[in-house]
Amino acid sequence: MLLNIGDKAPNFTLPDANGESVSLSDFKGKKVVLWFFPKASTPGWTIEGQGFRDEFKKFESKNMSILGCSADPPSKQKKFCDKQNFDYPMLCDESHSMLEDYGVWGLKKFMGREYMGISRVTYVISEDGLIEKVYDKVKTKSHALDILDDL
């Protein structure tokens, strides 16, 4: 189940693409855009990530940090980040614990097949660590700009 506006965002510590530990608490006093994607280097998620990359300075000017997260291992995330020149942390939750805490890991259905996976969801977390916005219907090409327009 997804988190709701006003909920406290669960803290986490996960490795990023470089194997460095990143915690939500590292960003206290800043808003955080936390976007989840099913798999690194796939077309839709690449477009979504490029949007955040291209608008990175605008997010920074609003005192906001961007974090991406999937269940990919750091080595795969690193290739993805390096190829796309992503300037923001891409987190790796291979155990799915944080993905579960945020309600984005669960049963999915596609073409008559059921499997466990990550839902495409983005949260905006306030400076105080509360869920400020929930995006569960994402348009990959315009998602970053849609968030900027909302804030």
Task: List PLM regions with ranges.
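Chalcogenol-based redox active-site neighborhoods
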Residues: 1-151
